[in-house]
């Protein structure tokens, strides 16, 4: 059985790209939800405290993280190598956002640490690695 699609790209490239795009679009939706006061009211108190007291630089970093991640995924699926650099910018945004989140002094539970802090970092780092792999294999050029 042949593992490559008609475009000469392994089938997993499309699956990983699509799943990563969905993940990052969820981040974009979350960003817009946090900008809406009515939606923000539905968040838990600990989450609202982080969002409401967030400085402009952290909000900007969050925007770079989520919009960069979504744009990078679109570029990856379009097989453009610039996706790698967009993912690097996105990871930088994630790290700055996490710097603020960890600095607010809220005691996070294990689930919150995994969902709010570790998963975005892991996903952003993975996408950098994966886009570099895709370049090496000639899937994006």
Where would I find each of the regions flagged by the language model?
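Topology signature of small-to-medium multi-pass alpha-helical membrane proteins
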Residues: 1-141
């Amino acid at each position: 059985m042949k593992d490559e699609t008609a475009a000469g790209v392994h089938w997993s490239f499309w699956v990983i790209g699509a799943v990563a795009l969905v993940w990052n679009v969820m981040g974009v939706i979350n960003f817009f939800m946090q900008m809406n006061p009515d939606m923000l009211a539905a968040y838990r108190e600990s989450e609202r405290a982080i969002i409401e007291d967030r400085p402009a630089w952290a909000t900007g970093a969050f925007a770079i993280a989520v919009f960069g991640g979504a744009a990078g995924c679109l570029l990856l699926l379009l097989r453009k190598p610039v996706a790698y650099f967009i993912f690097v910018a996105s990871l930088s945004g994630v790290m700055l956002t996490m710097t603020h989140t960890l600095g607010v002094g809220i005691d996070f539970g294990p689930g919150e640490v995994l969902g709010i802090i570790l998963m975005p970092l892991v996903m952003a780092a993975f996408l950098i690695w994966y886009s570099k792999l895709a370049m090496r294999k000639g899937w994006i050029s």
